[in-house]
Amino acid sequence: MMATQTLSIDSYQDGQQMQVVTELKTEQDPNCSDPDAEGVSPPPIESQTPMDADKQAIYRHPLFPLLALLFEKCEQSTQGSEGTTSASFDVDIENFVRKQEKDGKPFFCEDPETDNLMVKAIQVLRIHLLELEKVNELCKDFCSRYIACLKTKMNSETLLSGEPGSPYSPVQSQQIQSAITGTLSPQGIVVPASALQQGNVTMATVAGGTVYQPVTVVTPQGQVVTQALSPGTIRIQNSQLQLQLNQDLSILHQEDGSSKNKRGVLPKHATNVMRSWLFQHIGHPYPTEDEKKQIAAQTNLTLLQVNNWFINARRRILQPMLDSSCSETPKTKKKPAQNRPVQRFWPDSLASGVAQATPSELAMSEGAVVTITTPVNMNVDSLQSLSSDGATLAVQQVMMAGQSEDESVDSTEDEGGALAPTHISGLVLENSDSLQ
């Protein structure tokens, strides 16, 4: 395969370069000189295009073998070849320079534009090769980390499963530890005394409650030291471990029970404390963060539970109280305007008499003067303007005074059953004088 082949500058000789040019059937560029040309150029082709001429100039350039070699290295690096590096290309450049100097061949042609194109193309491919090398290093680093993580996980699973063939199985571990410390009781856990004095001990347990992994000591300075088992060891009985395990399980059960209680209905003591605070601060029932922490400490609840309780209390306790208090207060309703009938305060004869009477004035004592001007063409509809409270009161007083005075002066008018229209104006004037 191409990815496994080793490339060198020798694989791009002038014979292959000439073969490429011959296969393309292009003629030599007059601006570039071929070092191996014998001075005989092929006959010019009339159908040659500028693109073909540019291709021929590139293939005839002295730096073309180096460009082709770099391009092949980039392809191999893209395919994942491990032998392609930027350092190897530096060696290839040195070999190319030595070979060109040894053969006496030039590095450039007589066309500066083509020379500049070749140099920039080599630079671009070199940068591309460096970037591919960085990507390859990152991939290798990721693969190594991933493999190490898998190995660690597999070792831990093998250690916990206690397979007979694994290096951490009880049989294998007993043989290793017996070779170091003699005999080892399978009922206990072996811990070196020096490890307990220096720092924490990292141990791994397997089925049966026995530790078979070598002891790793973590010093107070953070250094990890692995120590071999020594004869002076401390044996911890399985009964003590079982007791410790039972205590841990009981603590876990208690925590689970307390968490379940908190998730359900809150304790009555907690609700009483929060309810009392709510009614004490009913004007502004929004506790601060410090107050929430204090309430949570008193009620043995979390801040989230306290916050949720106050949110629900403001909506379910305070809001119904406010709604009920607002419903008890009497609501003032605007009285609709009523169309009072024309003959509510006076008979038909009085209304017809007022319509034909001359203008008159009504005056009340104590400065409250009500002036009523009644033109001759006043109709019944215009009397509706007198239906206000002040005008109605004045008309009632005038009528009552006129009726009392009329009864004392002349009793013959009562027999007619109605007041004469001609006496209305005089009655109104006399009553107004008497009121003054």
From Swiss-Prot:
Residues 23-50, 401-436 are annotated as: Disordered. It is found in: Nucleus. It comes from the Eukaryota. Coiled coil: none annotated. One of its GO terms (biological process) is T cell differentiation. Residues 404-416 have a biased composition (Acidic residues). Interacts with MN1. This is Homeobox protein PKNOX1. It comes from Mus musculus (Mouse).
